[in-house]
Amino acid sequence: VGPTGVGKTTTVAKLAAAYSLAAAKGSRPLNVRVITIDNYRIGAKQQIEIYGNIMNIPVSCAETPSDLKALIDMYQDVDIILIDTIGKSPKDYSRIAEMRHFLDAVGQVSDVHLAMSATTKASDMREIMQQYETFGYGSLIITKFDETTCVGNIISALDEKKQSLAY
């Protein structure tokens, strides 16, 4: 989960590739599926589908909470399901609540990560972390490290909120 423009879709694609390729070197390939619930941003579905086609990883689109639940149930035997979520402003409380309702339909989710850009100001990072607490994220994914030379804001925000870094 995370605000708009931080690279959630690209990160999901990178994680899908990493999980499937890393496992291919082992005894058996990991069975990875990607589900997008981003029916809001123009071209979002097509973007993740292109990534999936390139990597030969199935991508599905859930338009409703019940669609998402059905897809999760259908994929219960796969190793990893990655869900590409809608980017929302941390100040858009109604949209965040709507997405929370969407994800609640799934039931127990193993891991929720909050994605944030390394270029985000420390004060904005703290606000984003607070607003997205409703999703029960366990760690952060920091994107766009190549776009900044200062990482103190990230370290400060993680330390203040006692959060760990996943990727």
Per-region residue spans from a language model:
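Walker A/P-loop NTP-binding motif
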Residues: 16-22
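Switch II (G3) loop of P-loop NTPases
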Residues: 1-4, 29-43, 50-68, 72-98
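Short, aromatic/basic amphipathic alpha-helical patches
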Residues: 47-49, 157
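Conserved lysine of the Walker
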Residues: 8
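Short, glycine/polar-rich helix-capping loops at beta-to-alpha or helix-loop-helix junctions
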Residues: 43-45, 152
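Hydrophobic positions on the alpha1 helix immediately C-terminal to the Walker A/P-loop
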Residues: 11, 15, 47
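Conserved catalytic-core segment of NTP-binding enzymes
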Residues: 33, 64-73, 80, 90-167
